[in-house]
Amino acid sequence: MQLQPSHDSQCSTHQSVIRDFNTEFNPLLEKPLSINEKLTIFAELYAVMKENMEKRDLLDRRYLRMARIWAENSYCRRRQVGAIIVKDQMIISDGFNGTPAGFENICEDETGVTKPYVLHAEANAITKVARSNNSSDGSTLYVTASPCLECSKLIIQSGIKRVVFNELYRITDGIDLLRRAGIECVHIPEL
């Protein structure tokens, strides 16, 4: 018996297999499953899940590398951060830290302190998607540094369900808030 769930039905397929295990009943055959049948189903399900996880990890790393390249567009001397919003394996928005449109592209004052009106990469990407015909609801945000508290509020309100980041910022209150809101946070330190 081969299990080949589609990506769309993966969760419901997993749930029905688990339900079958719990009831020891296969609705297709209308007889109890033997231990060997259960083990076979479990092994096939595990193989599908492992393959999906490996593909997801590969895509996560690729999108993070894209966010890192996008960060190079920032004029900030102190820290360059890039962000990409992905939905259904399509990039729907991007952003990098910098000044608002129409301002000079200088992020720091003469003493090297970041100007107060500089936007973070996440905020730039979220506001960009808000002005488009796309929706960030259910999407994934890839960002080169973990979000701050203010950006985390925007992430929650925009409907983003997953945040993948490269560098862990020393202040973790943003990540803590995202986790409290039920948003999956994935730290990939090595690309």
Where are the regions a protein language model picked out?
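Zinc-dependent deaminase catalytic domain
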Residues: 32-191
